[in-house]
Amino acid sequence: MLHVSDLMREMKCDCFCWNSAHNSLHQESFYKMDCPFSDLWRNYLNANECGLGHSMDSNEQSLKLLEENEVVCFARFEYKECRTKIPYLKKLENGYMAVYPHLSAYPKENEALIMKVNQMILSHCGVDIVENRIVYLNKEYVRQDALDLNELLCISDKLFNKRNHLSKTIAECMEEVDVDLDGWIERTKEILNRPSVTPVRTKQCTALRRCNYYSVCFNESNEPDDSILFFTTNQHKLDAYDRGIRHIHELPLNQIEGFRLQYAQYMASKTQKPFMDRAALQVWMKQIKYPISYLDFEWDTFAVPPYMNMKPFDVLCFQYSLHVETSDGNLTHYNFFESKDCRRHFIEQLIKDLPKAGTILVYNMEGAEKLRLKQLASQFEEYREELESICSRMIDLSKPFEAGLYYNSKMRGHYSLKSILPVFSKDVSYHDLDIQNGLNAVFAYRTYDEKDEEEKKDVKEAISTYCQMDTYAEYVVYHGLIKEVEKDA
């Protein structure tokens, strides 16, 4: 037995399809939801009093539900051992309307493929879908005291293009899709029935973001630190690896695009020592003024805004760690942790703890801490001036690495703080922490309010210790760069 989702995975990669069925990975939701999304869209569509399908329903049971109800949610159907579930079916004079709710602000035109497949499967079962709709989140909705579903959710017969504009109708998109359903089902069955699959590296393995099964398919632990596989944004590296090239410096120069970061990697590989643009690093360091504040936030993302003045997919900061270093080398730590709607207290405590002058060093700030403060400024206008002042003093500690001013092959093509820390310190490490990455911190935070007081204390300590490690790592990395610049100067 397979599901329509298996067909979609087959489109991506044989290994992804097979691993999803045989090596399923537990994944926490990226978004925090205070209630199931299905509760919200069913209320929006007035579908609380309707027929409900169940996981093992046969075609006959689903057809009976449709016969007895004007609206059926979660109806199951099967064709050639391929099952599917339709979120919402409404009876019309000439057939049925299917509605597909998306926990997204911009359901894309490629969603028409699964709608076409579902339409074909239901057609084989004697159910004619004549209209399709999507329900999606209104990105511009700003919550007031109560959640307004009529403002939060939208319904449309169109899908979004790559520029996030409603463009073609669902019907037009479906007309452009050509599906050999029988062949697709048989091909997917054949893949899933194999005892194993042989992985093949392609650009799709790391496109947009690395596949969850990448480390399952490819063990790169034995690759050299300067492996050609770690050559950032190089379009020839996979072909080169297949030809037997193992080190970055072995790649012909005419196959190197010439980005600054690539040059840093190439030189580190060629010389077998760290590459450093000393002059550029010195210029970058001159802008950093004492006292230096090393800052890091932890936050959770809410698809549906839980509190006033929040929008869909806004975040809520629940933790910060702050190390403040004075010119005489003294290092002081400040910490904040709260649950629920702690935004105002977060802002007030941060303003209080941060020095009024000096540089604020943040790792990868533009899409993280700086963006978080801008969002808070829009939610709490009375603090806008102070928050914007904080943003103006921020300097991104990741820039020297991302811009190729410093590269050590031990980084193995990675530029996260955790990847860079071991380059500058063997003693400071995340390995012994109960929480070792930001996602684990978020998932621990989500359970915080459900714990008893003793457990809450443990969760708070684990999250705070992890966040404190981030800011101390920033301190270690910055001073590591200083030592590199001063070495043999």
Language model features: what each stretch is:
Residues 1-94, 235-271:
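Metal-dependent nuclease catalytic cores that hydrolyze phosphodiester bonds in DNA/RNA
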Residues 19, 219-221, 240, 249, ...:
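Short helix/loop capping segments that flank catalytic or ligand/cofactor-binding pockets
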Residues 69-77, 291-301, 396:
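Two-metal-ion RNase H-like nuclease active-site motif
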Residues 71-75, 83-90, 98-105, 109-181, ...:
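Conserved DEDDh/DEDDy metal-dependent 3′-5′ exonuclease domain
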Residues 98-100, 280-356, 380:
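Conserved RNase H-like, two-metal-ion catalytic cores of nucleic-acid enzymes
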Residues 162-223, 420, 425-489:
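Acidic, Mg2+-coordinating catalytic module of metal-dependent nucleases/exonucleases
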Residues 198-250, 339-343, 350, 388:
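Helix-loop elements that line ligand-binding/catalytic pockets
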Residues 250-297, 302-304:
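Long, highly charged low-complexity segments
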